[in-house]
UniProtKB/Swiss-Prot annotation:
<dbReference type="InterPro" id="IPR036257">
    <property type="entry name" value="Cyt_c_oxidase_su2_TM_sf"/>
</dbReference>
<feature type="binding site">
    <location>
        <position position="257"/>
    </location>
    <ligand>
        <name>Cu cation</name>
    </ligand>
</feature>
<keyword id="KW-1278">Translocase</keyword>
<dbReference type="Pfam" id="PF02790">
    <property type="entry name" value="COX2_TM"/>
</dbReference>
<feature type="binding site">
    <location>
        <position position="214"/>
    </location>
    <ligand>
        <name>Cu cation</name>
    </ligand>
</feature>
<feature type="transmembrane region" description="Helical">
    <location>
        <begin position="87"/>
        <end position="107"/>
    </location>
</feature>
<dbReference type="InterPro" id="IPR045187">
    <property type="entry name" value="CcO_II"/>
</dbReference>
<comment type="function">
    <text>Subunits I and II form the functional core of the enzyme complex. Electrons originating in cytochrome c are transferred via heme a and Cu(A) to the binuclear center formed by heme a3 and Cu(B).</text>
</comment>
<dbReference type="Pfam" id="PF00116">
    <property type="entry name" value="COX2"/>
</dbReference>
<keyword id="KW-1133">Transmembrane helix</keyword>
<protein>
    <recommendedName>
        <fullName>Cytochrome c oxidase subunit 2</fullName>
        <ecNumber>7.1.1.9</ecNumber>
    </recommendedName>
</protein>
<keyword id="KW-1003">Cell membrane</keyword>
<comment type="similarity">
    <text>Belongs to the cytochrome c oxidase subunit 2 family.</text>
</comment>
<keyword id="KW-0472">Membrane</keyword>
<keyword id="KW-0249">Electron transport</keyword>
<dbReference type="InterPro" id="IPR011759">
    <property type="entry name" value="Cyt_c_oxidase_su2_TM_dom"/>
</dbReference>
<dbReference type="InterPro" id="IPR002429">
    <property type="entry name" value="CcO_II-like_C"/>
</dbReference>
Length: 332
């Protein structure tokens, strides 16, 4: 019994759909997802992979079928049918990519917005008014226009979604130089060549380049942000999986660009506290002397004793100076 062509086409469509859906979710091309935001990025990547797999199987399948079905037969000297264009087919293969691209654009915009890429707290009108003001005040100076653009209150960065904006993040200052990353923790005074942060707590990286443009990239977080000289940028994330992850410069920054790497350590809260305790700078003796003390119960000699010792002044000399009268009145 001959199987109808419509049934064969339906079966082929079902097979292509099943294979595309399975491979789109099980391709294994992405590294481990170390944050909730990474799962959002993986969602759009898996969606794109599903569509790409289906299109690949469909197009390559049609090509292989045509190569076999319409190959030149032995002793066939005839010409093919004079077909010139196919308007319905051209409309179809124009409409399908249009729908796919539009769907991907809407989906990617939604993901980018959820990641905090569009900062609703920064007014774009404010930036425009500032640019117009500088343009009117310094009509002939393009240098002022460029400097204004760098100093404006324009959001440059990516961060948490709106539901997590109220959480107090761990602040880390990041300096990108050829060819290293320097991480400074203002809360503890720690300076490190590696990034350390606890899981399940937002981390805000305030980044700036010291020479050329760099790009801060942690693949496991699915986040990348340009680091620009003279202009700060921000990257906010919330790691969810403990581990060691590479920090990579993703912008060609010089001859040794490939060696500009560091490590991000995602600790448990207890491990992070231990790291801070082990690496926090110890207060020096001079710093300890500046700490507040209960001075109300001290005598003048007791209060001045530590300072006199540091200056090399003996208490006996201070007592002699106290007993002496000033000769200033005799000189006047």
């Amino acid at each position: 019994m001959k199987i109808p062509g419509s049934v064969i086409t339906l079966l082929i469509g079902v097979v292509i759909t099943v294979v595309s859906l399975w491979y789109g979710q099980n391709h294994g091309l992405m590294p481990v997802a170390a944050s909730a935001d990474a799962e959002k990025v993986d969602g759009i990547f898996n969606y794109m992979m599903t569509i790409a797999t289906g299109l690949f199987l469909l197009v390559e399948g049609v090509l292989v079928y045509c190569l076999i079905r319409f190959r030149r037969r032995k002793d066939d000297q005839t010409d093919g049918p004079p077909i010139e264009g196919n308007v319905p087919l051209e409309i179809l293969w124009t409409a399908i990519p249009t729908v796919i691209v539009f769907t991907l654009a809407v989906y990617s915009f939604e993901v980018y917005n959820n990641l905090g890429g569009l900062d609703p707290t920064i007014s774009r009108d404010n930036a425009g008014q500032q640019m117009a003001h500088n343009h009117m005040g310094h009509m002939g100076s393009m240098g002022n226009m460029v400097a204004m653009a760098g100093d404006g209150d324009v959001a440059l960065g990516i961060g948490l979604d709106s539901e997590e904006q109220g959480v107090n993040p761990l602040m880390v200052d990041v300096k990108g130089i050829q060819y290293a990353w320097i991480f400074t923790y203002p809360e503890t005074g720690i300076i490190s060549g590696e990034l350390h942060a606890p899981i399940d707590r937002p981390v805000q990286l305030n980044m700036e380049a010291g020479d050329v443009i760099h790009a801060f990239w942690i693949p496991q977080l699915r986040l990348k942000q340009d680091v620009i000289p003279g202009r700060g940028s921000t990257l906010v994330f919330n790691a969810s999986t403990p581990g060691q992850y590479p920090v990579i410069c993703a912008e060609l920054c010089g001859a040794y660009h490939g060696g500009m790497k560091s490590v991000f350590y995602a600790h448990t809260p207890e491990e992070y506290d231990d790291w801070v305790a082990a690496n926090a700078p110890a207060p020096t003796e001079s710093m300890a002397m500046t700490l507040p003390k209960a001075t109300t119960a001290m005598t003048p000699n007791e209060y001045l004793a530590p300072y006199a010792k540091e200056m090399g002044v003996q208490t006996e000399a201070l007592a002699q100076l106290k007993d002496q009268t000033s000769p200033v009145g005799d000189l006047l």
